[in-house]
Amino acid sequence: MRAEKHHKGWNEIKTNDSWAIFKIMGEFVNGFEKMSKIGPCVSVFGSARTKEDDPYYKLAVNVSKKIAEAGYGVITGGGPGIMEAGNRGANLAGGTSVGLNIDLPFEQHDNPYIDSDKSLDFDYFFVRKVMFVKYSQGFVVMPGGFGTLDELFEAITLIQTHKIGKFPIILVGSDFWTGLMDWIKGTMLKAGNISPEDLNLIKIVDTEDEVVEIIDAFYKGHTLSPNF
């Protein structure tokens, strides 16, 4: 793909970029139109590669079921693995189940547990990320890879820089996440690259009950609304 782009002239690239603006606008308009109607939701993130017999898949189902039973919808990336588990849990509880799918050359396909009227497809990661951040009342982050970390640190950065209001960010699975948090404390914090209070943005838990307790406790003192 990149080799092909090298052979294009700058004028051709400029023209293509100009037309891409309309596609980007269309994704934003369609996303805002649909997402504005879903009500309070919590986003569940994690690896697309997690298998159904994995303990974290089962935990993600239970976490999402509990979230839906507490009155929140569940938003995922719409694909397999932990994303499927998230939609599955919401579906089992009869709750709102939203999927924000991304067009990829591998891995990604819509899972069958998304509400038929709440499945959105995106070509652009950055448009999709806006939908997660704008319409989520909390981020629940299960074990995952680079994409999961991307979503996690995007939210932390936006809250830290006061571009959006604070909302719960919950890492599920202490065995998986403790090493990362130890590195953040022992390296980033020690070097003065973050402040001690920045660490308060993140909670690590191991059960579905803890997830819902944190979210409910937070919204006893905050209003449920889109983040910007």
Predicted segments, located by residue:
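Active-site/ligand-binding-proximal alpha/beta "capping" segment
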Residues: 123-175, 219-225
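Glycine-rich beta-alpha loop segments
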Residues: 7-100
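C-terminal functional extensions of proteins
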Residues: 171-228
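Short gly/pro/ser/thr-enriched loop/turn and capping motifs at secondary-structure boundaries
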Residues: 104-108, 148, 176-179
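Acidic/glycine-enriched connector segments
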Residues: 81-141
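Structural/interface elements that position substrates and couple domains in central-metabolism enzymes
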Residues: 2-6, 21, 218
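Solvent-exposed alpha-helices and their adjacent loops that cap or buttress functional pockets
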Residues: 35-37, 68, 91, 111-114, ...
